[in-house]
Regions:
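C-terminal helical subdomain
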Residues: 6-10, 21-27, 232, 248-313
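A short, exposed helix-loop element centered on a Lys and neighboring polar residues
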Residues: 163-164, 217
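Conserved mid-core segment of classical short-chain dehydrogenase/reductases
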Residues: 111, 119, 133-150, 168, ...
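Conserved glycine-rich cofactor-binding loop
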Residues: 45, 52-54
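Catalytic loop of short-chain dehydrogenase/reductase
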Residues: 133, 171-225, 237-238
Length: 313
């Protein structure tokens, strides 16, 4: 999954990083939490960072629609968290919701948020590392060092914190649901198609997202035997507040709804894609067509990051 971009339009290289399946831009039946995935989250506790707006908020609401026992959300704005909590309660009064203000780069705050979630609701079945950061793009030699590095702090350190502190509870979840003949212990890491591309001036965002994909693979290597299912996902091109920091000529690619990503995450947490653990997946991909490619993906070890070299003849 290596971009061949050498100049011109970097988006042209996306086709080299994509599956030949139908692409979706809005919610559709197979990932709809009110139809195909109705009650799929019943009895489960969902932990979401960056859960107060955009994709995180849509994901929290989607899990409520899918019948989650509880949704725990974190973000830095208490007012936005309260608004999302109210929205979840309106969506499904039977889904409990709690929140805490939290900076994902702060070790103590993430640990405290995870502990609070477990104290309130008894565990964690799905952890979604959704919080992100995107500043104005700049060439490496013209970038702000503090801002450039903060992208890594928010994406990698933030995801690591979620993984590290939720892991014991996710392992418990995986075992508990397996004993019931079902699936638990799901971990979602927010990546991007940009992880596979080379956009001039996007080095901080795209390198950190590329590292997310590798981190996902390591979770699978270290904890796959514990029943953990981890996915690094491209949520689609969503016109979030952060995305507006991209150059304006990229805005035309922001055509996907946050509900698409949210439904895709609920689908992943349902156990239907457990076979694809440790891999990069896109919310745009039709899930039924993706599933039809299971044997090929596993046989050829696709949707992972590897160095491509020419074999000796």
């Amino acid at each position: 999954m290596i971009s061949n971009f050498k100049g011109g339009d970097p988006m042209a290289s996306i086709d080299n990083q994509d599956l030949s399946v139908t692409k979706h831009h809005t919610l559709y039946d197979a990932i709809d939490p009110t139809s195909a995935l109705k009650s799929s989250a019943s009895g489960k506790v969902i932990f979401i960072t960056g859960g107060s707006q955009g994709i995180g908020q849509a994901t929290a609401v989607a899990f409520a629609k899918a019948g989650a026992k509880a949704v725990y959300i974190t973000a830095r704005s208490e007012q936005a968290l309260k608004e999302t909590q109210d929205l979840i309660r309106q969506t499904n009064p039977d889904t409990q919701c709690a929140y805490s203000t939290c900076d994902v780069t702060n070790t103590a705050q993430v640990e405290a948020a995870v502990s609070d979630c477990v104290d309130r609701f008894g565990g964690i079945d799905v952890a979604d590392a959704n919080a992100g950061y995107l500043d104005k793009w700049a060439k490496i030699g013209e970038s702000d060092p503090k801002s450039w590095w903060y992208a890594w702090e928010a994406h990698i350190k933030g995801a690591y914190h979620v993984i590290r502190f939720s892991m014991p509870y996710l392992i418990e979840s995986a075992k508990r649901w397996a004993d019931k003949g079902s699936s638990g212990g799901h971990l979602i890491l927010l990546s991007s198609i940009g992880a596979q591309l080379l956009f001039p001036t996007a080095s901080d965002y795209q390198t950190s997202k590329h590292a997310i994909n590798r981190l996902c693979e390591f979770v699978n290597v270290d904890h796959g035997q514990d029943g953990i299912k981890c996915f690094a996902i491209h949520p689609g091109g969503v016109a979030t507040e952060l995305a507006r920091n991209m150059p304006e000529d990229h805005y035309s690619y922001l055509t996907d709804t946050p509900e698409l990503a949210a439904g895709f995450i609920v689908w992943l947490a349902s156990g239907k894609a457990d076979w694809a653990t440790g891999r990069f997946l896109s919310a745009n991909w039709d899930v039924e067509e993706l599933t039809s490619l299971k044997d090929e993906i596993l046989r050829d070890d696709l949707l992972v990051n590897r160095l491509r070299v020419r074999a000796d003849s």
